[in-house]
């Protein structure tokens, strides 16, 4: 493991891990042990946990890595899914996270062209693994980009993660952070290359996320 991860952990600096499946399981496992936040592609949760249901796989990841405050799976044109943990010792009965996800999908406004977010309440959640967590599930939708404007998706994942980091540093609420990150990724798609289309902070398309309080 590289020294700067250990130094950040020693200095209690939060660590966001981009869980790339190309890393070896041992190397990535050590990083996830230190993670404060985890972001991954939609294929990673099943590959890591052997659980095909994404919400249940995200729950299993948070059970495996108790220091992580949330895990986000990016889902391309389907947006993203986030499982956020809070510390709570209440003994309430657990609710199946798959059922929670289905309920949230019904609340998504499919006619919205711009990114949106729907969230469950905080509750004790169970999945197809053995553990439970107290937290909430959020679904963020992607921007609906007209076909003539869709140029190149290279670097969209990195753009999304960069926006999540900005959201964390500015203490954005998750309900705003997810649409913001999806919007940044959507803007990037309109130019060739990983960096050319990245928006400036002054971009008018981001103003609704940046002018409001968290």
Question: For the regions a protein language model found, what residue spans apply to each?
Answer:
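Short, well-ordered alpha-helix to beta-strand connector turns
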Residues: 12-13, 35-36, 68
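Short beta-strand/loop segments at the ligand-binding rim of alpha/beta enzyme cores
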Residues: 8-18
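A generic structural signal for short hydrophobic patches within well-formed alpha-helices
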Residues: 45-46, 80
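Conserved phosphate-binding/catalytic region of the ribokinase-like
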Residues: 24-25, 52-214
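Structural alpha-helical scaffold elements that stabilize or flank donor/cofactor-binding regions
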Residues: 30-31, 38, 64
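A short beta-strand/loop micro-motif in the catalytic core of glycosyltransferases
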Residues: 35-45, 71
């Amino acid at each position: 493991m590289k020294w700067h991860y250990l130094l950040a952990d020693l200095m209690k600096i939060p660590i966001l891990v981009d869980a790339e499946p190309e890393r070896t399981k041992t190397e990535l496992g050590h990083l996830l042990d230190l993670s404060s936040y985890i972001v991954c592609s939609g294929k990673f949760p099943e590959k890591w946990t052997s659980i095909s249901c994404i919400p249940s796989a995200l729950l299993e990841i948070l059970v495996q890595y108790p220091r992580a405050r949330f895990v986000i799976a990016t889902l391309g044109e389907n947006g993203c899914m986030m499982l956020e943990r809070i510390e709570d010792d209440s003994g309430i009965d657990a609710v199946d996270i798959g059922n929670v996800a289905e309920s949230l999908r019904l609340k998504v406004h499919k006619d919205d062209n711009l990114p949106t977010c729907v969230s469950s309440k905080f509750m004790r959640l169970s999945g197809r693994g053995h553990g439970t967590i107290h937290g909430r599930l959020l679904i963020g939708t992607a921007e609906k980009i007209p076909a003539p404007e869709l140029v190149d998706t290279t670097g969209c994942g990195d753009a999304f993660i960069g926006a999540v980091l900005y959201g964390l540093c500015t203490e954005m609420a998750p309900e705003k952070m997810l649409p913001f990150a999806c919007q940044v990724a959507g803007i990037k798609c309109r130019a060739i290359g990983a960096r050319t289309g990245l928006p400036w902070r002054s971009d008018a398309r981001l103003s609704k996320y940046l002018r409001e309080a968290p």
